[in-house]
């Protein structure tokens, strides 16, 4: 994990290069990626902190999909402004800070026709206990709530670092919120999808905290 973490940090230097080039990423599930354009309706993109996770949102915006991303500011007071600058300039200009105000911002973006991307693998103290690998884990239910309230499809996205500075990004089959009874049931489905991502690529999951802390 730490090797991948270090490589991801170094790669912030090359975000401009990644923004302007195409041959470093292979995209699978392009049909799913383009659902917001084909259906002229926002979606919720969900993923976890794998490989260089920043490239997922970058590739979405490179397809001219209107996107806003929800992020957690870094604890480092000095480094955080630089990271925010780089994200807005090269990844996605619409950055939403995690929190109550961020939820309101996400809703406003959705009403304007923007898709929303967020990570679901971090512990959220105000979240619900949703099972992850058989153990209850405080988990955000925001993607489920937004999907149910606004009838938005959820698109799982995963990324894997390959050899020679190459990446593979997979946009998986959409999830219809109408197939679930409530936010808990839908959130459990999302955690199961996250489990499969982790099982497939455990060494590239950036996991630096106690995910199951209560």
Regions found by a protein language model. Name each.
Residues 1-47, 82:
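Membrane-anchoring hydrophobic helices of lipid-metabolizing enzymes
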Residues 4-7, 39-99, 125-130, 135-136:
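Catalytic core of membrane glycerolipid acyltransferases/transacylases, capturing the structured
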Residues 6-10, 78-79, 112, 149:
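Alpha-helical membrane-targeting segments
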Residues 20-23, 47-49, 68-71, 106-110, ...:
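Short acidic/polar alpha-helix capping motifs at helix-coil junctions
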Residues 26-28, 96, 172:
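General small-molecule cofactor/ligand-binding pocket signal
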Residues 34-39, 62, 100-214:
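Non-catalytic C-terminal accessory region of glycerolipid acyltransferases
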């Amino acid at each position: 994990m730490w090797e991948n973490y270090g490589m991801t940090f170094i790669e912030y230097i090359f975000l401009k290069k990644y923004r302007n080039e195409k041959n470093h990423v292979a995209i699978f599930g392009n049909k799913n990626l383009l659902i917001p354009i084909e259906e002229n309706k926002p979606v919720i993109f969900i993923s976890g902190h794998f490989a260089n996770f920043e490239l997922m949102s970058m590739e979405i915006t490179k397809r001219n999909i209107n996107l806003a991303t929800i992020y957690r500011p870094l604890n480092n007071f000095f480094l955080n402004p630089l990271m925010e600058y780089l994200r807005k300039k090269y990844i996605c200009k619409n950055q939403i800070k995690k929190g109550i105000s961020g939820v309101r911002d996400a809703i406003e973006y959705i009403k304007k026709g923007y898709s929303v991307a967020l990570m679901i693998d971090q512990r959220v103290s105000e979240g619900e206990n949703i099972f992850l690998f058989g153990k209850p884990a405080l988990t955000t239910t925001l993607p489920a709530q937004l999907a149910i309230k606004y009838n938005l499809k959820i698109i799982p996205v995963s990324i894997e670092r390959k050899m020679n500075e190459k990446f593979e990004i997979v946009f998986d089959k959409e999830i219809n919120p109408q197939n679930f009874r409530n936010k808990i049931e839908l959130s459990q489905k999302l955690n199961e999808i996250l489990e499969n991502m982790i099982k497939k690529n455990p060494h590239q999951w950036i996991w630096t905290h106690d995910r199951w802390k209560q």
